Amino acid sequence: AAIQAAPVYFDKAASVEKACGLIAEAGRLGATVAAFGETWLPGYPFFIEAPLSDLWWEAAALYLENAITLPGPETDALCAAARAAGIDVVIGVAELDPATRGSVYASLVFIGRDGSLLGRHRKLKPTHHERSVWADGDAKGLVVHQRDYGRLSGLNCWEHNIMLPGFALICQGTQIHIAAWP
């Protein structure tokens, strides 16, 4: 199921609650996978189009405040929702890495229907103004996840216009690919 719904922008608690409801609905409707867009949690940082304005600084601070850690209470809730619905979930998040003292990544989180964290993919190279908010990812997350229905992978947005990330997933035999865009 492609989740076509907006988050509660820059409110991670409300967005997680909404995501859990959407996951439950997708499960009730018979979906195998619920796929959310790029940084659905807590929302795509559209403020990046207004660089160096007062709005940018205020929004950037709020965005950082609403980024999530992996694992953390937000992923715990999403994992519980996936388990209750009996479906896999792929959701884009703004991931705060405490080890880097403030780096935020545009990450895709893969959650199994058993409620386990299968993995994450950090966007390799943020595009244009995104670089003012997100750090560069790495290739560790270019992984295809074996599921009972096929081999699952995903990339964020403009990564689909770069040949090597997709090629890496193709070489691993991806069959179901989540193309997460804002």
Task: Mark where each language-model region is.
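Conserved protein kinase catalytic core
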Residues: 10, 44, 126-128
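Short amphipathic alpha-helical segment that frequently serves as the phosphate-/nucleotide-binding helix
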Residues: 13-20
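Glycine-/small-residue-rich active-site loops that bind phosphorylated ligands and cofactors
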Residues: 7-10, 161
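Cys-nucleophile CN-hydrolase/nitrilase-fold catalytic domain and related Cys-dependent amidase chemistry
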Residues: 12, 24-113
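Active-site catalytic loop in hydrolytic enzyme cores
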Residues: 70, 75-76, 80, 96-182
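Short beta-strand segments enriched in small/hydrophobic residues
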Residues: 1-6
